[in-house]
Amino acid sequence: KYSTMIYNIYLKYVAPEDMHVYSIDEVFMDVTDYLGIYHKTPYELAMTIIQDVLSQTGITATAGIGTNMYLCKIAMDVEAKHIAPDKDGVRIAILDEQSYRRKLWDHRPITDFWRVGRGYAKKLEEHGMYTMGDIARCSIGREDEYYNEDLLYRLFGINAELLIDHAWGWEPCTIADIKSYKPERN
């Protein structure tokens, strides 16, 4: 019930093609094209939407603002937890690639990061890597050094590519990519 109500509030601000429902209580929005329309910064637009949700449902929200979907997710899941809530309990965190590296490259535990579970963490720890900064530094190691991109690919196969991207705060997938995806038919 509340999930539908909240989604309908989002639709007042953003078209469905610019939203990706990630879970029952989590939505990604690409608001890039809306900032000029509403004459708002990303923070101001997030606060407007959150205040609308709060006034209509009584539910307080947290928002993560980022330059890509990964940074939005990390801003919400990791960074927002360290921000004091406002008078309504709202927390909004903002990350770009530089602030991510500055604030979170040394963050522990590494399992706080999207798509890094206990299995990945254990493999990384066995090779002396405990943070996203460690992964990023490993990815640029020279060929003749132990810590280099090849080590990550040996440990994680093709999944190393996304792990390396995320270590640097990069995310190649966009909401438009998700919306345009068509699964292959057998």
Positions of PLM-derived features:
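Residues that scaffold, gate, or flank divalent-cation-dependent active/transport sites
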Residues: 1-24, 28, 165-167
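Generic non-transmembrane alpha-helical segments
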Residues: 5, 9-13, 48-57, 123, ...
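Short, conserved phosphate-binding/catalytic loop or strand-edge motifs used
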Residues: 24-30, 67-72
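Catalytic palm subdomain of template-directed nucleic-acid polymerases
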Residues: 28-50, 128
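Flexible, glycine/proline-enriched loop segments at strand-loop-helix junctions
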Residues: 33-40, 90, 104-112, 120-126, ...
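Long, highly charged, low-complexity intrinsically disordered interaction regions
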Residues: 45, 49-111
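DNA-contacting surface of Y-family translesion DNA polymerases
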Residues: 112, 120-186
